[in-house]
């Protein structure tokens, strides 16, 4: 079973993404961190005990990975075109407790599991070989958190909640 984990805004750069959320919601998103495996960086906004909004972009200070970046970020021209056309909320990420089973049944749509870390946080994330969103964002990116509580529980609570989708 898949459960909504987070919503992803893919930005041409972090400053633009954070400014967009500030303009829409009137608050500044706290910094998340860097993803060494993907050469990306994010800001995160808690939306509930196990739900958050992410702004993600290429980290200009990181080395480019030897593989495609997640969320379609290996194609900066497409990211920029999507951004300029108003396509900001690019997709959803859904968690599962059995990523291997899901990918065994539907790997052609979602790709393969990649191990990720950010500080003490660990997770596995399905990434297509080209790094693109499954079905151009019509399907969520599946993932599975490592041991411990959901990371949203440790994020600052700025009072934002997702009322519906």
Give the ranges of each region predicted by the language model.
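Active-site-proximal cofactor/substrate-binding loop regions of enzyme domains
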Residues: 1-55, 60-64
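Vicinal oxygen chelate
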Residues: 33, 44-46, 51-57, 74-84, ...
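Donor-sugar nucleotide-binding helix/loop cap in glycosyltransferases
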Residues: 59, 67-72
């Amino acid at each position: 079973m898949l459960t909504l984990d987070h919503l992803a805004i893919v930005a041409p750069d972090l400053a633009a993404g954070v400014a967009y959320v500030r303009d829409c919601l009137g608050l500044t998103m706290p910094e998340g961190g860097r993803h060494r495996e993907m050469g990306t960086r994010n800001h995160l906004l808690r939306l509930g005990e196990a739900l958050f909004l992410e702004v993600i972009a290429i980290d200009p200070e990181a080395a480019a990975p030897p593989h495609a970046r997640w969320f379609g970020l290996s194609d900066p021209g497409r990211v920029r075109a999507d951004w300029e056309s108003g396509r900001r909320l690019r997709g959803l990420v859904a968690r599962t407790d059995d990523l291997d089973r899901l990918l065994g049944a539907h790997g052609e749509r979602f790709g393969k599991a990649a191990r990720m870390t950010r500080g003490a946080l660990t997770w596995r994330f399905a990434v297509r070989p080209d790094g693109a969103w499954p079905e151009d964002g019509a399907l969520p990116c599946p993932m599975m958190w490592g041991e411990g509580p959901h990371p949203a529980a440790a994020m600052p609570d700025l009072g934002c909640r997702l009322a519906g989708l």
